[in-house]
């Protein structure tokens, strides 16, 4: 391991204090685009809601959800153009449904897939037991008389969307050319619509949802309570879960709404949590994706990193300055890239980086370069040009970042404080945290001696 003695924690080097305006200039440039982005989103959403209202008029089993304002909030935060999910509620009495978890789910696959059975003793569910969305059970001993079939529900919803779009265009309820349904195809778990709003095009994925009371154990964990406003986890848990199509026969728990509520809760706390997320999302779009939005980190990846960073750094002073806030997310992100594992925030056994198409080695190099020398990515105007500063880290940092892969106990505040100090942004005066961080240094120093 690099280093032979623990230096005094670096509060702020003089040249870093000079950099602070650079971070704020970059943030202000992002924020200047927020209002137009929100207006574009609201226009696009209005077009989509007009279509969905017609869907409901054609088939009252499908309900327009007007209660969700979190997508607009997130759309304003980010610079990336990832598709947005829009949920269409199934107006079924969810208490009359039984979640039958599949035994075939592999460990680490995240939320279990399940079937949704209609209980035999349930009454008033005749609209949900028609052949277009329902499959009769062949087993007499089952508690259920049959199941809601995702592929059938999606097929009905797709046909309704097509009919609704035709109606809205014919009656001029939506602007000409504002909605493209070319990707609305059979067999998809999400129904994709491209909506034009001014010069911006926003892709929405329409998803049928069954909302049901169901425990999410992670929301009851003591660790999460440290980083969030008091009582918020209990209120979020009371919402229940959203079940969305996983495949033709099975549903799965969607955590999108729960995670968005957690992100929104962070925005109510003082500090730069959401500002730093906006900065990293912009840097990701401009510098880390290598010109492609299809095979890089997504806003959801970065959102998960912030949620973990908020539990690892729960103190208000961790988020008091903008640069330090960015680096609290960066050290978590770098660790996840180095170990090739980003745990799902509510289902930590599920690795969000295991999906195909991500060149984690290349992404790591870009993120590490930014963390070591962020200036070139932050300069947005010729007046921001200045002399290049030396790298903040040495070549041995990747070995340190991989420690949690072999010893999960490193996934703790003291370890990440140690990494912050390596990047010269540990600006905490708490004696207990300094002592714990120095203990981590001594531990890594001992490991380095044993391996040499």
Swiss-Prot record:
A Pfam family annotated for this UniProt entry: Mab-21_C
Gene3D superfamilies to which the protein is assigned, alphabetical: 1.10.1410.40
Transmembrane segments: none
Protein name, per record: Protein mab-21-like 4
Organism: Mus musculus
Gene designation: Mab21l4
């Amino acid at each position: 391991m690099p280093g032979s003695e623990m230096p005094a924690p670096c509060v702020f080097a003089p040249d870093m204090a000079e950099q602070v305006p650079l971070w704020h200039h970059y943030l202000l440039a992002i924020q200047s685009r927020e209002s137009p982005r929100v207006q574009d989103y609201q226009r696009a959403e209005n077009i989509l809601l007009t279509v969905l209202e017609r869907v409901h008029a054609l088939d009252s089993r499908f309900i327009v959800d007007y209660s969700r304002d979190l997508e607009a909030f997130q759309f304003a935060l980010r610079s990336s153009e990832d598709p947005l999910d829009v949920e269409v509620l199934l107006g079924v009495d969810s208490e009359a449904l039984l979640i039958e978890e599949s035994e075939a789910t592999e460990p680490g696959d995240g939320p279990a897939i399940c079937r949704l059975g209609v209980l035999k003793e349930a009454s008033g569910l005749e609209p949900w037991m028609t052949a277009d969305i329902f499959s009769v059970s062949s087993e007499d001993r089952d508690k259920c008389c049959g199941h809601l079939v995702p592929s059938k529900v999606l097929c009905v919803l797709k046909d309704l969307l097509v009919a609704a779009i035709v109606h809205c265009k014919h009656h001029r309820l939506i602007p000409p050319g504002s909605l493209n349904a070319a990707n609305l195809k059979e067999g998809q778990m999400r129904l994709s619509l491209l909506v034009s709003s001014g010069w911006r095009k926003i892709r929405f994925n329409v998803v049928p949802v069954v909302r049901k009371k169901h425990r999410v154990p992670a929301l009851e964990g003591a660790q999460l309570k440290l980083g969030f406003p008091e009582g918020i986890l209990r209120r979020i848990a009371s919402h229940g879960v959203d079940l969305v199509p996983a495949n033709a026969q099975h549903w799965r728990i969607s955590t999108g709404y729960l995670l968005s509520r957690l992100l929104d809760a962070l925005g109510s706390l003082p500090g730069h949590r959401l500002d730093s997320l906006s900065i990293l999302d912009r840097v990701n779009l401009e510098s880390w994706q290598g010109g492609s939005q299809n095979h890089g980190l997504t806003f959801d990846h970065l959102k998960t990193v912030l949620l973990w960073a908020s539990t690892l750094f729960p103190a208000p002073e961790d988020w008091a300055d903008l640069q330090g806030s960015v680096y609290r997310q960066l050290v978590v992100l770098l660790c996840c890239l180095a170990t090739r594992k980003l745990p799902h925030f509510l289902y930590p056994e599920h690795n969000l980086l295991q999906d195909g198409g991500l060149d984690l080695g290349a992404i790591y190099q870009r993120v590490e370069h930014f963390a070591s020398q962020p200036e070139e990515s932050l300069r947005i105007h010729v007046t921001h040009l200045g002399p290049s500063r030396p790298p903040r880290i040495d070549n041995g940092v990747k070995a340190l970042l991989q420690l949690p892969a072999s010893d999960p106990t490193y996934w703790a505040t003291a370890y990440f404080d140690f990494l912050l100090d390596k990047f010269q942004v540990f600006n905490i005066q708490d004696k207990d945290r300094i002592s714990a961080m120095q203990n981590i240094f001594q531990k890594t120093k001992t490991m380095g001696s044993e391996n040499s």
